[in-house]
A protein has these predicted regions:
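Intrinsically disordered, low-complexity activation-like regions
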Residues: 1-18, 23-121
Length: 121
């Protein structure tokens, strides 16, 4: 389960970087991560490994999923990084830095945001 989540969530991001395909496995990775958490697999792992189960939550463009991610990452070294992601999702409902790759039109506010430091990951 952990290995499959890593392959779907992390490998696809790196193998297909700068293409829409980089995000194509996100729904499946999130579904597997949700199931792993439901079954308590994350609680049986060291936090350094459990973090990889939680990463699909961080990569999601859903406000609801980020509410869950905030709780999952609480107390972990990745917590502040999750909060940085959540702020963007709360503000825009998506990651503006993905717009061009995914063929989405950016709003004027998103375009302004993209000129700011740390607007992308």
């Amino acid at each position: 389960s952990l290995a499959e989540i890593i392959v779907l969530d992390q490998f696809s991001r790196n193998i297909y970087r700068n293409t829409a395909q980089a995000f194509s496995q996100d729904p499946q990775a999130l579904s597997l991560a949700q199931r792993a958490i439901e079954l308590g697999f994350d609680k049986k792992l060291p936090s350094s490994q459990a973090a990889f189960i939680y990463m699909p939550f961080m990569h999601s463009e859903s406000k609801v999923i980020h509410q869950q991610a905030e709780q999952l990452f609480k107390g972990m070294s990745n917590y502040e990084f999750e909060l940085k992601h959540k702020v963007i999702i709360d503000r825009f409902g998506r990651y503006p830095h993905r717009n061009a790759i995914l063929g989405r039109e950016s709003t004027p506010e998103e375009l302004q945001f993209l000129t700011e430091p740390n607007s992308s990951f």
